[in-house]
């Protein structure tokens, strides 16, 4: 009788621990993906007008919305770039990069993922929503007659681009600062933010995997590194060796293998290696001001300097797509 009681107590304790870990996984996923991402009213976001771009609005399936950007006074190439944005208020945070490509004659299709800025949706739902957006953008582009389709993505967008390339045939992929998978991303984010200690994160990781499986099925835990290998698509992986958001060790840059992959390590760069070192420094200063709610200083912040392009990195991207 005592043994039976002991077994019941042990089982009850184990069940309680499992339920607690699952609850932490669900709640942390909700914090990351359970709300919409809109523009911060205290920040400046560059628009098409700032760069004299034409912006044709488009609506895709399930309320996904975006624009096809181009430069009217420049001959248009037959190659289309689909830009996949990172976490935040959608592609409007990348207008400087979009304008850069347009200045070289590329039309650029940029679509906000579910729950971001222009697109519908009460929340982001999860990481795989970005992949679904990239796939929808590819299908839309093909319906419009574009045959030479190239994906360029940053951070979450890089993950989306790599995973989408395993689902749809595209010409080339450029993945900048790409994370590997949802569970690894959640784990690293929790540690970097100081929310959870690494030993606890290691225990919770399987539960993040479970949450994403329930959300999206087998696709929910897609590995960008495995997708990059599977697709066989010529791919340029770019990563900064100082990246603390997606560390080099836990990146697709480090894990992905294949002769069709080209890798460029941006030395001295953090999470936005397409920007100059000064721009990244300025962004770090801005981030600290946001944390301290120093909004008066933010209104006088030099946003142009904080989005300055690194010509070497951007040219590598252009040369890769055109090559």
What are these regions (language model features)?
Residues 116-145:
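Catalytic nucleophile-loop/oxyanion-hole region of alpha/beta-hydrolase
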Residues 244-250, 274:
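Conserved alpha/beta-hydrolase "acid-adjacent" motif
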Residues 231, 237-239, 243:
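Short beta-strand/loop motif that positions the catalytic acidic residue
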Residues 3-60, 64-71, 287-296:
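An N-terminal hydrophobic leader/cap segment in hydrolases
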